[in-house]
Each structure stands twice: as structure tokens, then as C-alpha cells.
A protein has these predicted regions:
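Short helix- or helix-capping micro-motifs
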Residues: 97-98, 242-247, 296, 300
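Start-transfer (signal-anchor) and selected internal transmembrane alpha helices
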Residues: 1-107, 210, 321-322, 335-356, ...
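Membrane-interface alpha helices of multi-pass inner-membrane proteins
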Residues: 288-304, 309-310
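Transmembrane-helix signature of polytopic, membrane-embedded enzymes
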Residues: 169, 182-204, 220, 225-248
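Membrane-interface transmembrane helices that cradle and orient dolichyl/undecaprenyl
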Residues: 230-233, 272-288, 299, 321-324
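Interfacial juxtamembrane loops and adjacent helix segments
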Residues: 111-212, 386-453
């Protein structure tokens, strides 16, 4: 049997070495399997010491600091011995990225800084997974979080079966019955006759093991983002610098400890972007297209809003399709035969794409509609009135506010209004851009202790970064009109910029409309627009490059200050997550 397969339709495709590709897949599977085991080992070794030294999470944080010191020592040593290369630096960054994610998971109980995981009525994400684990069936209602597609809950349920078997071995063979689960129930909600009914210590422990999966989702996303940056033709130390931004972006760290469906959804969104760009830039190979379809379908099976990523991907498909039609028309005029076969082949590939993506991504929507009458795109909206933000006008909520309290009144997100005897005594945060900034750094939580010197400075640098990036974009427009064609990018770069712009705009507009439809503080959370992290990184990279190419005194100063502020924001938030507690 031949070791290569190819398409006879596209001449610029294609030949893939099946053997080489197979071993590459095996290497990645082996790597992530090994990291899962390592993460599990640290989970079982260090979670019992969560409150050691009378400070929550200190042991895990010390471990991470030691790891960072070792990585810095290795980097300095390699630099002095002239063995440092961009590839080695990138590997050190990725290792550090794994370490900070592992540490955050070890420092954060499964009930802390989560989204809709535990609730008093037992209709959150934890109960969703537990129902599948204990019954093998979907919930009988679509209450609260049960309206979501089941992929995240299903994977967690399967993983709990694995950890349940492992626990039985640890208890019976190694005599750890006194340790498990009693040492793994930090921050467990208090069970009463009315609240958290059915929650036991063992159930709480078992679900907490799914944080191991969250670390892996975040790590896989991290790798996918770095590989995507390579597809944008970033190389050398530039690639390492931009990779450091996406690796250490604070919400990526938080996702490593959060067990709702956001991390899994985001992972599949970034994988779909990666395989779409591979298809686009590396010969339009069919298997890249099919993997992209699978990732989109699985993302929608975790959370239907994953479909937003279809907008930039669909634009790529449409662009290539119409470009192929244009080629076929030109070839027909020149008397060439068979030109339309390529168009037909591409159309067939797109149909195959839909045949994979649509059933996987939409079957639950059909099931929920037939079972519960749940409409497509349904979002649970029976929210706590204290989350409402209609106490301020639409302009202040959506664009700019001149209320100093919204800027400086709170460091972290204030999600709920304070209401006493039916009277609001303190309003929550309501401005969308500011809430997005705060939640991009710290989530929508204010349950942090310690590290305020880092978090406060990070917020200030982050706010300044946004202002400076906006000025950079305006300055790029000025340079374009001033220098004309000298500022034009080449065709591949224009395609990259167009894709990034469409992707970023798709999510920001989606979030904008979401907040208009549901004016609550929780709908402003940055977790709904996570793919814009890649967009921001690339927009900053391109703007910085264009301004430096112009070589003006103002532009160079602007680039220096903005780069410093962005680097400071990422560095300070990383330090913050190394020292903060619950």
C-alpha cells in the first residue's frame, strides 16, 4: 500500500506522508496523555495540602515558583553559553505556561471561582455531569444549565468513571481510605435539607478530579494558539514574544481550573481556526477541512455559541470558492477544459464538511426542541435581578462612562448590586469595555486575597494598553493616507489581517448584541469572546510592525510605551496568580 495519498484535482495540494503524519499524531497523543498523568499525580499529591501553613494554595504556589526559577536559570545559562535559540525559548515558555496552569488548578477548589457549577437547586454543571455519570442518561429537564449541549458533562462523567476506578485501587490496595475523599473536599458547599441535596463528600471529590481535564483543555488550547501563530508566518524571537502573550494571558490561566463548558468550547474553537488556516495555507487538503468540521461540531456540542467561529471560517471558505469560480471562468474563456471540476470538487468538500459538522453540532438542539420545546439559540435568562445594569443609560453601558467610580471604585468586577430592604445601596459594574477589561484579567470574581499590588498595577497597565492600541490603529490609518502604497501589505499579509479582523469583529459584535439583549453584569464576561485574545495579539503585532516601518519619532515612542504596558500587564497578572489566595 502506498504511504502517500493525494488529490488529483488540486495541483497545489497535497501529498501527505501517511506514515509520518501517523507518528506525528501518536507523538502528540503521547505528550498530552503524559501531561494528563503528570497533572493527575500532582492533583493527588498536593490537593490535600491546600490549607497547609494556614494559607490556601501556598504549597502549590511554592512549587510553581521553584519551577519558574529553574526555567529562568536554564534560560540564563543557555544565553550565556550561546545555546539559546528561539525554538528553545519557545519550549521554555510553553513549560512555564503548563506550570502556571497546573498551579492555578491546585490552588483553586472546584467550587471556587466557577461559573454555574454548583447551585442550591442542584441544576448546575456539576449535577449535569453527575446525572450522566450515575444514570447514563441526559437530565429529564432543561432547567438552568441543563439546556446546554452535553459534551462537557459527558466527558466529565466518563473521566469520573476512570477516577472512581483509580480511587478504589488507592483505597483498597494502598489503604488510602482515610485520605480519600476526606482530604480532597476543600470549600465543599454546605449541604442542608433544602440546598445542595444529594451532594456527598465522595461526589464532591470525584467531580473535583475533572479539574485535571480543565488543565489539559487549557494546555491543548495553548499549543493550538502557538501553532496558529506559526501559520501567520511568525518566526524566531518574534514568535516567542507573541506566544508569551497568548500563553500567559490571564484568562487562559483561569480556564485551567474552571470546569464548566467554556474551556472545552474554546479549545475546539481554536483547533477549528488552526485547521481552517492549515487548509487555507497548506494546499487545501481534505483531511484538514474534515478535522476543522469535527472541531466546530464538537465545539457546538459543548456550547452552541461556539458557532460564532463559523463566521471567519465561512468567510475563508467563501473567498476560496469564489476565487476558484473566477479561475474556472478565466480558464473557460481561454479554452481550457476541466476547469469547473475543481469548483465541483470544492463544493463536494463543503457538503462533506456540513455532513460532519451539522449533525454533531445540532443534534442536541433538535432533541431539546422536541423534548422541551427549547428554541435554537435559547439562553437561560431568569437571572437574579441584582445582576441588572439598566440603572445606567445605554451609552454609558455600551461605550464610555464618565463616572469615576466605574473606573476606580473597584479593582475586581462587582457583578451584583447591593440591595437592602428593596433599595439598591451600591450599584454593580455596568460599562461593557471596562467590565471586559477587568474580567479578561481576573474573571468576574472578587474572591481574591493578596497580590493587590500586582493586580491593581496590572489593571492600570491594561487600561493604558487598550488606549494606546487604539491610538496605534488610528496612527496606522494616518500613515496609510500619508504614505499611500508604501504602507500596503503584501497579499498573504492582507489575507491574515482580514481573517483576524473578521474573527475579532464577529465575537465583539456578538458580545455587544448579547449585552443589549440581556443587560446583566454576567453577560459582559470576557469568557464569551476568548478568541479575540489571538485577534488582539495579531492586531498589535501588525500595527507595531507598520509603525516601526514608518520610523517616525512619535511612532517609535508610541510602540515602546505600548509594548511596555502590554508586557507589564501580562507579567503582573502572572505574578498575581502566583501569590493570590481565596
Amino acid at each position: 500500500m502506498s504511504e502517500t495519498t493525494s488529490s488529483s484535482v488540486f495541483s497545489d495540494n497535497e501529498r501527505i506522508n501517511v506514515k509520518e503524519y501517523f507518528f506525528k499524531v501518536v507523538r502528540y497523543v503521547g505528550l498530552f496523555a503524559a501531561l494528563t498523568i503528570i497533572t493527575g499525580v500532582f492533583f493527588y499529591l498536593l490537593k490535600p495540602y491546600y490549607e497547609f501553613w494556614n494559607r490556601k494554595g501556598a504549597v502549590a504556589q511554592c512549587l510553581c515558583v521553584v519551577g519558574f526559577i529553574v526555567l529562568i536559570f536554564v534560560g540564563v545559562y543557555c544565553k550565556k553559553t550561546k545555546e539559546m535559540t528561539p525554538d528553545l525559548l519557545l519550549k521554555l515558555i510553553l513549560i512555564a505556561g503548563y506550570l502556571i496552569r497546573l498551579t492555578y488548578m491546585l490552588c483553586t477548589p472546584v467550587s471556587v471561582r466557577q461559573y454555574d457549577t454548583y447551585n442550591r437547586a442542584s441544576t448546575g454543571h456539576e449535577t449535569y455531569a453527575w446525572i450522566i455519570y450515575s444514570t447514563g442518561k441526559l437530565p429529564a429537564t432543561n432547567d438552568y444549565q441543563f439546556y446546554h449541549p452535553p459534551l462537557n458533562a459527558f466527558v466529565q462523567a466518563m473521566f469520573m468513571h476512570v477516577t472512581n476506578g483509580l480511587t478504589e485501587i488507592l483505597q483498597k490496595v494502598f489503604g488510602l481510605g482515610d485520605v480519600i475523599p476526606s482530604k480532597y473536599i476543600a470549600a465543599m458547599p454546605k449541604v442542608t435539607d433544602r440546598y445542595y441535596v444529594g451532594l456527598t463528600e465522595y461526589r464532591y471529590y470525584l467531580y473535583s478530579t475533572t479539574q485535571i481535564l480543565s488543565v489539559m483543555w487549557s494546555v491543548i488550547t495553548m499549543v493550538a494558539l502557538v501553532k496558529t501563530l506559526k501559520l501567520f508566518c511568525l518566526k524566531g524571537y518574534t514568535l516567542a514574544a507573541v506566544s508569551a502573550f497568548v500563553v500567559f494571558f490571564p484568562r487562559h490561566i483561569e480556564f485551567a481550573g474552571q470546569v464548566n463548558n467554556d474551556a472545552l468550547t474554546y479549545m475546539f474553537q481554536m483547533l477549528s481556526v488552526y485547521y481552517c488556516l492549515r487548509w487555507w495555507k497548506r494546499g487545501r487538503r481534505l483531511y484538514d477541512l474534515l478535522i476543522c468540521a469535527l472541531c466546530i461540531g464538537l465545539g457546538m456540542m459543548a456550547k452552541i455559541s461556539a458557532a460564532v467561529i463559523c463566521i471567519p471560517i465561512g468567510c475563508v471558505f467563501a473567498y476560496e470558492f469564489f476565487r476558484e469560480i473566477g479561475k474556472a471562468v478565466s480558464a473557460k474563456k481561454n479554452g481550457e477544459s476541466g476547469a469547473w471540476k475543481k469548483v465541483g470538487y470544492m463544493a463536494a468538500c463543503y457538503v462533506l464538511f456540513l455532513c460532519i459538522c451539522a449533525p454533531i453540532g445540532l443534534w442536541f438542539q433538535v432533541y431539546a426542541y422536541k423534548t422541551f420545546g427549547q428554541k435554537l439559540g435559547f439562553v437561560f435568562s431568569n437571572l437574579n435581578g441584582a445582576l441588572g445594569t439598566t440603572h445606567h443609560n445605554w451609552f454609558e453601558r455600551l461605550f464610555i462612562t464618565f463616572d469615576p467610580n466605574e473606573y476606580f471604585g473597584t479593582l475586581y468586577c462587582q457583578t451584583f448590586c447591593t440591595i437592602k430592604d428593596g433599595v439598591t445601596t451600591h450599584y454593580n459594574n455596568y460599562n461593557l469595555p471596562l467590565f471586559q477589561l477587568r474580567s479578561s484579567l481576573f474573571g468576574e470574581f472578587n474572591t481574591y486575597k493578596g497580590g493587590e499590588c500586582f493586580s491593581a498595577t496590572a489593571f492600570a497597565c491594561g487600561l493604558l494598553s487598550l488606549i494606546l492600541v487604539f491610538i496605534m490603529l488610528v496612527y496606522c490609518i494616518v500613515l496609510f493616507f500619508k504614505n499611500g502604497k508604501k504602507m500596503l501589505a503584501d497579499e498573504p499579509e492582507r489575507k491574515n489581517i482580514a481573517f483576524i479582523a473578521i474573527m475579532t469583529a464577529s465575537f465583539l459584535i456578538s458580545e455587544f448584541m448579547f449585552y443589549i439583549k440581556m443587560p446583566y453584569a454576567c453577560t459582559m464576561d470576557f469568557r464569551y469572546v476568548m478568541p479575540v485574545i489571538l485577534g488582539f495579539a495579531m492586531i498589535f503585532y501588525y500595527a507595531r510592525r507598520r509603525i516601526l516601518a514608518a520610523n517616525t519619532e512619535f511612532g517609535n515612542a508610541l510602540v515602546f510605551v505600548s509594548t511596555f504596558c502590554v508586557a507589564a500587564t501580562i507579567s503582573l497578572t502572572t505574578l498575581f496568580y502566583l501569590v493570590c489566595s481565596v
